[in-house]
Curated annotation (Swiss-Prot):
Nuclease that cleaves host 2',3'-cGAMP. It comes from Orgyia pseudotsugata multicapsid polyhedrosis virus. This is Poxin. The record marks 88, 219 as: Substrate binding. Transmembrane segments: none annotated. The gene is P26. Homodimer. The active site is at residues 43, 174, 178. The substrate binding site is formed by the N-terminus of a monomer and the C-terminus of the opposite monomer. HAMAP family: Poxins (MF_04143). InterPro entries: Poxin_vir (IPR006853). Its EC number is 3.1.-.-. The keyword Hydrolase applies. It is an enzyme of class 3 (hydrolase). The lineage of its organism: Viruses, Viruses incertae sedis, Naldaviricetes, Lefavirales, Baculoviridae.
Length: 230
């Protein structure tokens, strides 16, 4: 669903209106965890809670970014981002737009991102990759994984070290990992449930676990977004 709009954005206050109606926007830092029950009433996409619904976007969609200097381009890249709100883990691999450094300097949190004069996302975070800046265009990405899950415990994201692989909440050299996983035939009944996130430059892994027993293991395309705006 695209949002038909007459968008008004105040760069000084960050206030956004569509058709004269104020839009609620809360942008999270990459990986941020918050506890605020009032946010449950809003739509949540990776890195943002808002009162509007963003459409699904495909790789290659051409978008315009609201800046004082202007900015536009195609979403030819993707990146992974997430936040946790009231124990709800909201994550996804979303389209991203490569932007030059001089445009990044003019970006404003919450500024509209449009496609054919319709609101499709908001400026939320950027990622430095291979000498370029990627601006994520957060939404439910068409043809790629996004979602949410309730979780009781979550550790901080960890880098997958060279020569290691992941099982459950741990990473080990591959041969050791195979033996470790083989020993975990079933979880202890009283074991705590948890969620773990691991990443490298190109991939993100999410595991859902009961103790050290792995219940589910997802491999998703990266990179993991690592920069908000200061």
């Amino acid at each position: 669903m695209y949002i038909k709009m007459e968008v008004e954005f105040d760069e000084d206050t960050g206030a956004l209106q569509i058709g004269g109606q104020e839009v609620f926007v809360m942008v999270f830092e990459p990986g941020q965890e918050v506890f605020d029950k009032s946010l449950d009433q809003h739509h949540q996409f990776p890195g943002v809670a808002t009162s509007v619904v963003f459409p699904q976007l495909s790789i290659g969609t051409k978008v315009d970014v609201f800046t004082s200097s202007g900015g536009f381009g195609a979403t030819d890249h993707h990146c992974f981002n997430y936040h946790v709100c009231n124990k709800r883990f909201v994550f996804g691999s979303v389209p991203a737009l490569e932007i030059p450094a001089d445009v990044r300097e003019h970006l404003r949190i919450g500024a509209p991102i449009t496609c054919a004069d319709r609101l499709v996302s908001l400026v939320t975070a950027v990622h430095a990759a291979d000498g370029a800046w990627l601006l994520r265009v957060t939404a439910a990405r068409a043809g790629q994984v996004s979602g949410h899950a309730r979780q009781q415990r979550r550790g901080a994201g960890r880098t997958v070290r060279a020569g290691r692989s992941v099982y459950g909440p741990v990473q080990l050299p591959y041969e050791q990992l195979k033996a470790h996983a083989f020993r975990k035939r079933r979880p202890r009944r009283d074991a705590a449930e948890s969620c773990a996130l691991f990443y490298n430059d190109s991939e993100v892994r999410i595991t859902f676990n009961k103790g050290e027993f792995e219940l589910m293991h997802w491999r998703l395309p990266g990179p993991l977004v690592s920069h908000g705006f200061k």
